[in-house]
A protein has these predicted regions:
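Short S/T/G/P-rich N-terminal loop/turn motif that feeds into the first structured element of a domain
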Residues: 1-32, 44, 65, 95-102
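Short, low-complexity, polar/charged sequence segments that are solvent-exposed and flexible
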Residues: 20-24, 57-60, 72-75
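A generic secondary-structure signal
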Residues: 28-29, 69, 73
Length: 102
């Protein structure tokens, strides 16, 4: 799942200490779903989004539960935009080319 998002201006007005506390809650929730691997890419200045997060899992139900629980955390107050979410299938470059009929 590919999940681009943008933080609010209010997020950046918080102290580093406060932001770290909010992120600690985020990390705690994420650790409850060990089947979901998280990869964060910062893209500020490259695209319309500030971050793109890639979640890797063979359990879509776990991903959906994780996202729902994260939306109930303090950190969600500071998310300005978090859509669209893209569902993807991991495959080799060779298999990707074959799937395109090339």
């Amino acid at each position: 799942f590919i999940y681009p998002f943008v933080k609010t201006r209010e997020w950046y007005l918080l102290t580093q200490f406060t932001r770290q506390g909010i992120m600690d809650e985020h990390i705690y929730v994420g650790n409850k779903y060990p089947s979901v691997k998280l990869n964060t890419t910062y893209c500020f200045g490259i695209d319309d989004y500030e971050f793109v997060v890639a979640f890797e899992t063979d359990s879509p139900d776990d991903f959906l539960d994780l996202v729902q629980e994260l939306r109930e955390t303090e950190g969600s107050r500071y998310v300005k935009e978090d859509t669209p979410i893209f569902s993807c299938v991991a495959m080799s470059i060779e298999d990707t080319v074959k799937s395109l009929g090339c």
